[in-house]
Amino acid sequence: MVVDDSAVVRQVLVGVLNEAPGIEVIATAADPLLAIEKMRQQWPDVIVLDVEMPRMDGITFLRKIMSERPTPVVICSTLTEKGARVTMDALAAGAVAVVTKPRLGLKQFLTDSADELVATVRSAARANVKRLAARVTAAPLEAEVKHTADVILPAQTGRALAQTTERIVAIGTSTGGTQALEEVLTALPRVCPGIVIVQHMPEKFTAAFAARLNGLCQIAVKEAANNDRVMPGRALIAPGGKHLLLRRSGAQYFVEVLEGPPVNRHRPSVDVLFRSAARAAGSNALGIIMTGMGDDGAAGLLEMRQAGARTIAQDEHTSIVFGMPKEAIKRGGADRILPLGAMAREIVTQLQ
């Protein structure tokens, strides 16, 4: 079901989704009250939802759905500061992913974002709705060409050189990751290792996401900027639309924010971050891969393990989508499989 007050946007979204094999839009609605009436007749598997609508706003509608009958919801939002803030509220209320709304250049949307919309809806359809309901509190694929991390950071053999005692944590996640990261980061004490994070999310939204977490956590959380130092008690989140790499200078770690082609159809890519962590930190790193669709991060987590890092994959029961962790486990990249609730404790105890 597509719920949006713009007839033009509804038409574009329906056209894109109905052309995708295996997807059928069973209904549309111009506002949540109309959507509720139609859902009484036939309940959708996935809802694509605008957040700013008349009669009832999307957040109120989303909370009603999650309390009565948890259903995967994809937020379709504008690339504005206000839109980003409201989208963060929607993700906290149980939405599984966000895609950017078609702007006036609808032809450009069909060229650039149609595949992202279809892939995100497919991912949402596989979400663990029981975990969605339990996770409620008050990503996206890009180009079809699939690159590996080699296009950003060519592979090299051997473990990290020059020793240091400073520890770091690298986390990668996608669908369901906003809620998962909130659960992990809010449980961390102020004194903990420096953390670098890739969460698949469109540009413009990661700054609002980081700001929201910063207000909830004991640790500091910010959107990463080029040459930011990775320091204890702070988490850096990759900006949407950019790759994030870990670099080493003497005994200190810094991040590099790079342009470049999508890797595993994602930008930022978890594989890019994990490969750079394997190279820069070696056995001083802890790699964690959490809920998400696809295989981004699976190869990189294995590289981290081979470089001497401790590595963890989230278990199936607590994952919204058990795709990325499953693939990492399958390839031998995870030396431990843990539920989401154990991640924060593991970060503190393993890296002491």
Swiss-Prot record:
Catalytic activity line of the entry: [protein]-L-glutamate 5-O-methyl ester + H2O = L-glutamyl-[protein] + methanol + H(+); L-glutaminyl-[protein] + H2O = L-glutamyl-[protein] + NH4(+)
**InterPro entries per the UniProt record, alphabetical:** CheB-like (IPR008248), CheB_C (IPR035909), CheY-like_superfamily (IPR011006), Sig_transdc_resp-reg_Me-estase (IPR000673), Sig_transdc_resp-reg_receiver (IPR001789)
Q: What is this protein called?
A: Protein-glutamate methylesterase/protein-glutamine glutaminase 2
SUPFAM superfamilies, sorted: CheY-like, Methylesterase CheB, C-terminal domain
Enumerate the Pfam families for this protein: CheB_methylest (PF01339), Response_reg (PF00072)
Entry superkingdom:
Bacteria
- Gene label: cheB2
Q: EC top class, in one word?
A: hydrolase
The text of the family note is: Belongs to the CheB family.
**Function text:** Involved in chemotaxis. Part of a chemotaxis signal transduction system that modulates chemotaxis in response to various stimuli. Catalyzes the demethylation of specific methylglutamate residues introduced into the chemoreceptors (methyl-accepting chemotaxis proteins or MCP) by CheR. Also mediates the irreversible deamidation of specific glutamine residues to glutamic acid.
What does the record give as EC number?
A: 3.1.1.61, 3.5.1.44
Q: Give compartment(s).
A: Cytoplasm
Where the record annotates domain CheB-type methylesterase, the positions are: 162-352
What does the record say about PTM? Phosphorylated by CheA. Phosphorylation of the N-terminal regulatory domain activates the methylesterase activity.
For biological process, the GO terms are: chemotaxis; regulation of DNA-templated transcription
Q: Which UniProt keywords apply?
A: Chemotaxis, Cytoplasm, Hydrolase, Phosphoprotein
Instruction: Quote the record's domain comment.
Output: Contains a C-terminal catalytic domain, and an N-terminal region which modulates catalytic activity.
Q: In the UniProt entry, which residues are flagged as the active site?
A: 174, 200, 296
Q: Name one GO molecular function term.
A: phosphorelay response regulator activity
Instruction: Tell whether Magnesium is among the UniProt keywords.
Output: no
- Give Gene Ontology CC terms: cytosol; protein-DNA complex
